[in-house]
């Protein structure tokens, strides 16, 4: 209804919403890392080799390409170091960079893991996303309580380490 004052600007608002939510830079990932000083550094301590490092509850949000509705939640990253580290805030920057497009949670999980591997040499990398999908809330089954969890483990798979990581999530 183009005569309704509340709806007149809705098409423009929708356009601006999608434009803002998917505002991805023209930089490719390597350029993005260079511009934002995202690089791994070798630890001076030999104790950093084989140490397990975990980051929990890193917020993430994106738009699902199936229904064009947001999904949001947390990312959990754990890795076994090969003597290299990455500044903790850099993980959030990588997640934000990769989530600024229409995607699926499964694809985003895979991309976060593979892109971290491009700049951080590790023995094992484990990435988990736990997200709420708006499509589950506002359409179909209208479930307010469900979350979707996606997980990926790259490189050496150590069940003991995975079990240790999982009890913290």
Region locations from a protein language model:
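A domain-level signal for the structural core that forms small-molecule/cofactor-binding pockets
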Residues: 1-169
């Amino acid at each position: 209804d183009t005569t309704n004052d509340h709806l007149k600007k809705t098409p423009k608002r929708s356009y601006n919403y999608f434009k803002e939510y998917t505002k991805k830079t023209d930089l490719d990932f390597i350029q993005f890392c260079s511009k934002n000083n995202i690089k791994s550094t070798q630890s001076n301590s030999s104790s950093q080799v084989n140490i397990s490092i975990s980051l929990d509850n890193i917020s993430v949000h994106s738009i699902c390409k199936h229904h064009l509705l947001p999904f949001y939640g947390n990312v959990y990253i754990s890795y076994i170091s090969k003597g290299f580290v990455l500044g903790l805030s850099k993980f959030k920057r990588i997640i934000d960079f990769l989530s600024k497009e229409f995607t699926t949670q499964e694809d985003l999980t895979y991309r976060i893991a593979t892109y971290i591997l491009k700049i951080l040499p590790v023995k094992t990398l484990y990435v988990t996303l736990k997200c709420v999908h708006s499509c589950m809330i506002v359409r179909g089954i209208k479930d307010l309580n469900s979350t979707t969890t996606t997980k990926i483990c790259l490189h050496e798979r150590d069940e003991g380490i995975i079990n240790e990581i999982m009890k913290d999530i």
